[in-house]
Amino acid sequence: MKILPPTLRVPRRYIAFEVISERELSREELVSLIWDSCLKLHGECETSNFRLWLMKLWRFDFPDAVRVRGILQCQRGYERRVMMALTCAHHHSGVRVAIHILGLSGTIRSATQKFIKPSKKDKY
């Protein structure tokens, strides 16, 4: 089976986000939270077009809450709809959560450099 040439591949975008929760969420719970929020807001037919995939996660422990940053892949043209659905999520399995969108990027590398792990000279 041949690999599709770049001209025929579906264009993708990467959404950098941060999840703040009362307790630590596993990767499976986070995937479930993302899919549930998209399904509740847009329905099954629309959500199937998003082509969502959770690429990477970084965990940061703070005294007051657990923060997880991640990169979510979606199809180009649906970024705004995915971001709307993510910000609407506030509860999952009895745990309060808040999702903040950090930014949008065309590559995983630039999303990581800009939003997830900023360099030391970029500190305020």
Swiss-Prot record:
Family per similarity comment: Belongs to the eukaryotic/archaeal RNase P protein component 2 family.
Source organism of the structure: Methanothermobacter thermautotrophicus (strain ATCC 29096 / DSM 1053 / JCM 10044 / NBRC 100330 / Delta H) (Methanobacterium thermoautotrophicum)
Protein name: Ribonuclease P protein component 2
Cystine pairings recorded for this chain: none
SUPFAM superfamilies listed in its UniProt record: Rnp2-like
Keyword entries, A-Z: Cytoplasm, Endonuclease, Hydrolase, Nuclease, tRNA processing
HAMAP family: RNase_P_2 (MF_00755)
Residues spanning the membrane: none
Function statement: Part of ribonuclease P, a protein complex that generates mature tRNA molecules by cleaving their 5'-ends.
Localization of this protein: Cytoplasm
Induction: Constitutively expressed (at protein level).
GO aspect biological process, one term: tRNA 5'-leader removal
Enzyme class: hydrolase
A single Gene Ontology CC term: ribonuclease P complex
Gene3D superfamilies: Ribonuclease P, Pop5 subunit
Source superkingdom: Archaea
Principal subcellular localization: cytoplasm
Xref: PANTHER family: RIBONUCLEASE P PROTEIN SUBUNIT P14 (PTHR15441), RIBONUCLEASE P_MRP PROTEIN SUBUNIT POP5 (PTHR15441:SF2)
Pfam families, per the entry: RNase_P_Rpp14
Catalytic activity: Endonucleolytic cleavage of RNA, removing 5'-extranucleotides from tRNA precursor
UniProt GO MF annotations: ribonuclease P activity
Subunit structure of this chain's protein: Consists of a catalytic RNA component and at least 4-5 protein subunits.
Enzyme Commission identifier(s): 3.1.26.5
InterPro entries: Pop5/Rpp14/Rnp2-like, Rnp2-like_sf, Rnp2_archaea
